[in-house]
Amino acid sequence: MRFDIVTLFPDCFNSVLNSGLLGKALAKQIAEVHLVNPRDFTTDKHRKVDDEPYGGGVGMLMKPEPIFTAVESLPVLPRREIILMSPQGQTINQSLLKELVTNYDQLVVICGHYEGVDERVLHLVTREVSLGDFILTGGEIPAMALINGVVRLIPGTVAKTESLTAESFEEGLLDYPQYTRPANFRGLKVPDVLLSGNHAAIAQWRYEQQIQKTRDRRPDLLEKLEQGKQGSRGAGGE
């Protein structure tokens, strides 16, 4: 998959792109990331990318021309999505990440800055995406999260496929508690069932822990899971 990141601050991506699973995926050419600075597409001597909003207001807006020209300079793959990182967008979740990795070969990710972008930029994008209901100084950090989440779902990035299918959110539940050696650390003991070797009992314990943790911390996920089950039963005519 190809990622084209339109950002005023390309240097801030360097450490992220060269470390961990993402760095390995790029080294193996499972994915490729290209950084594009809209400032390189300005036509004035000051290379200005922002201006005051019409009608007045606080702060500056990113101008449309450099963003449009930057995106139009990119190669176009058949299955391309142009994403604006915006607090007004669809919140990133596992379902969205799976949709993107399944349906697209190229993601163009535009990182806003200042007080946002000129509204006409929305005529260029095909989707707005958000990291959550809070404001950051720019779209770079949300873009990093999006790229990381998508790349790890590309086959070949994660060594064990079961690591993806068994992890939190894939089943609609939070993850169960996990432990490693030592079995007793400062009086904090690993639950006996995990040391029993009884795989059926371990599986049952883990499922119960998932239900309990999700009920305590994210009851909304349980509601969605139940609604999905009811919808499936309805579709089946039961």
Curated annotation (Swiss-Prot):
**The protein's Enzyme Commission number:** 2.1.1.228
**Keyword Signal applies:** no
Where along this sequence does the record place binding of S-adenosyl-L-methionine? 112, 131-136
> What's the catalysed reaction?
guanosine(37) in tRNA + S-adenosyl-L-methionine = N(1)-methylguanosine(37) in tRNA + S-adenosyl-L-homocysteine + H(+)
Q: Which UniProt keywords apply?
A: Cytoplasm, Methyltransferase, S-adenosyl-L-methionine, Transferase, tRNA processing
**What InterPro entries does this protein map onto?**
Alpha/beta_knot_MTases, tRNA_m1G_MeTrfase_C_sf, tRNA_m1G_MeTrfase_TrmD, tRNA_m1G_MTases_N, tRNA_MeTrfase_TRMD/TRM10
Q: Share an example GO biological-process annotation for this protein.
A: tRNA N1-guanine methylation
Which GO MF terms does the UniProt record name? tRNA (guanine(37)-N1)-methyltransferase activity
Q: Does the keyword tRNA processing apply?
A: yes
Cell location:
Cytoplasm
Any one Pfam family here would be tRNA_m1G_MT
What the entry lists under Gene3D superfamilies is as follows:
3.40.1280.10, tRNA(m1g37)methyltransferase, domain 2 (1.10.1270.20)
Q: Which Gene Ontology CC terms are recorded?
A: cytosol
Q: How does it assemble?
A: Homodimer.
Q: Which NCBIfam families match?
A: PRK00026.1 (NF000648), trmD (TIGR00088)
Q: Member of which family?
A: Belongs to the RNA methyltransferase TrmD family.
Q: Which PANTHER family match?
A: TRNA (GUANINE-N(1)-)-METHYLTRANSFERASE
Main function = Specifically methylates guanosine-37 in various tRNAs.
Protein name (record): tRNA (guanine-N(1)-)-methyltransferase
User: What species is this protein from?
Assistant: Nostoc punctiforme (strain ATCC 29133 / PCC 73102)
Encoding gene, per UniProt annotation? trmD
